[in-house]
C-alpha cells in the first residue's frame, strides 16, 4: 500500500473512532487489501469517508457493496436512519450472491425495525436470498408475511423447495399457482429429475404441453430429454424430440447433445450417431459421450474407430475420454491397444499418472501385466484410493498375494483410508494364498480398527477363504452369525469349496439355496453333477443332468481366446471351425504323449462315466483353453510368452496339463479364467494349485 492510501486509511480510521464505530476497527485491515485499494478503485476509502462525514450512510453502504465488503456494509447499516430501497436491494443482492445467511438476517431485521415498508422487489429479493442460502424455513416465513405476491414470488418458493428436494411442498405451491410461466414448469420438472423421479417429470412435461401459453423453453426440454433418458423410454424421447423441432429449438447444439445421450441410453445407438453427425461444433463432451455409448452397447470396433476420428480432429480428448477407452481395453483384455492409448496420452502432454492412473492400473491388471500396473502406481506422486485398490486386487488375481498385502500396507502409510472394496481385494489376496489366519485378522480389523461396517461382500470373501481351506464348521458358524441374508455369491463359494473337498452334504445344502435364488443358473447343476461324479454317485449325477434337461437349463460353453498380431482368435470346446483345427489337435496329441512320459495323468473322473477311458482322454483334448494355448504356441516364435483368456473357471485337467505344457515347451503361459490369473512356468503355476 502506498503512502497516499495509508494516509487516507488513517483519516478514515480516526473518523470511525470519533463516531464510536469501534466495531469497524477489526475490519479496517480489509480496506487496505487489493480488493479495495487497486488501480481502478484507489479512492474508495476517501469516498466512504466523505459520505460518512456527510451522514450519507446509504450511499457509503452502496460503495462497500460494490466492493463486496459485505460485513463492513452491514455494520455501517446500523448508522443509517432511513436508507433508500436501493441500499436494501444492494445489500440483499450481495448476501444472495455470497450465500451470507447471517448478514442477510441482519439486513432483514433492520428492515423490520427501521419502519421501512418494503415493496414487492425487496420482498422477492429476501425470498431469493433465503432460498439461495438454503434456509427454506425463513423463506417460507417471508412468503407467508408478504402482503402481496407476484409470479416471481411463487417461482422463487417453488424453485427453492425443488432445489433442496422438498418436492411435496414445491408441488403443493405449484398447484396453488393461478399463473405459471416456463420458469415455474422448469423448476418443478427439474426438481423431479434431480430427486430421481423422472416419470413424474415426464407427466408434468406432458401436462405443460396442454396448458395454453406455457411454451417450454430450452431448459425445460433439456430436462425432459434427461428424464426420458433416465427411464429409457424411447417413445417419450421421440415425442420430446418432435416438440423440439416444432418449437424451433433444434438449432441449439446443447440440446442435440442431450438428444444424443437420450437415444444412446435408450439403446438406439444408430439414432444417437445420426444426431452426433448433425452437430456442427462438436465438443469433447459430445465425442466422449458417443464413444462411451458404443462401448456400453458392446460395439467396440465402432467405439475405437470414433476415438481414432477424435484423435485426428482438432478437438482433444480429455481425461474422461481416455478413462472410457482404457476401460474398454480392460474389458476386452486388449493390452496392445491399451499401451498405444497410454503412449498417446504421454505424447500429447497429458500426465497419465495424475488423472487416469486408476484406469491404467485396471487395464494392465485385467490384461495380466501386473508389472506395468505396479509401475503406474509407483510413478504416481499420490495414488488415489481407486488406484491402490485396483493394484491390490490385480496382485491378488495374478498370484502375488504378498505383493497385494505390501501395497495395502503402503496405502495405509500414505494416509489413504481404505473402503469396503479395498478390503474385498485384501481378503481376496488372503483367499488366493490360503492365508486363513491373516484373512480373519483383516476381516475383524474392518470394524475394530478401521471403523467400517462389514458388507455382504466381506462375508462372502471370508466364507470363500474358509471353504477353500476346508474349514466347514467355522464356515457354518460365520454364516449363522451374519447380520444379513447370505447372497448367491456366498453360497456359490460354499459349493466351490465342497467341490474341492468332496463335502456332499454341505454341497447339497448350498445347491438348494442357489436353486431358490437362481433356478436357471447352469453352474449350480453342473457343479453338483461333477461332485456326484467325483464321488462315484452316478445315479445322482444322472438325475442332476436330467433335471437340467427338464427345466431347459443348458451349460454355458467354455470359450477361450488369445491375441496374435493384433488379431483375436476365439476357441470353443470341440469347435472344429478354426482353419488350423486339425494342426492344433495333432499338436496336442503329440504333447499328450510327452506329458505322459513326464507323469501326466488325465483327470477323467469328471467325464461322463458311460464313456470308454480312451474316449474320455480324447474328449479332454478339445477343451477350449488347450486349443487356444496350442494355437498360440504354434503361431509364435520359440520362447515367446503367451496369454490366453477364458470365460469359465479352468478345469482340473486343463490346469494340470498346462503345467506340463509350460515345462515341455519352455514357455511362460498366462491363463486368466473367471476367478484369477494362472501364470504357468517351468511346470509350476502361480496359484500353487489353489484356485
Curated annotation (Swiss-Prot):
Family: Belongs to the PPR family. PCMP-H subfamily.
GO BP, sorted A to Z: RNA modification
Record key words, sorted: Repeat
Name recorded for this polypeptide: Pentatricopeptide repeat-containing protein At4g37170
Molecular-function annotations in GO: RNA binding; zinc ion binding
Organism: Arabidopsis thaliana
InterPro entries: DYW_dom, E_motif, Pentatricopeptide_rpt, PPR_At4g14850-like_plant, TPR-like_helical_dom_sf
Location of the region described as Type DYW motif in the Swiss-Prot/TrEMBL record: 597-691
PANTHER family (alphabetical): PENTATRICOPEPTIDE REPEAT-CONTAINING PROTEIN, PENTATRICOPEPTIDE REPEAT-CONTAINING PROTEIN DOT4, CHLOROPLASTIC-LIKE
Segments of this protein annotated with the region Type E(+) motif: 566-596
Pfam families: DYW_deaminase, E_motif, PPR, PPR_2
Transmembrane helix keyword on record: no
PPR repeat segments: 84-118, 119-149, 150-184, 185-211, 217-251, 252-286, 287-317, 318-352, 353-383, 384-418, 419-449, 455-485
Upper taxonomic lineage: Eukaryota, Viridiplantae, Streptophyta, Embryophyta, Tracheophyta
Keyword Disulfide bond included in the entry's annotation: no
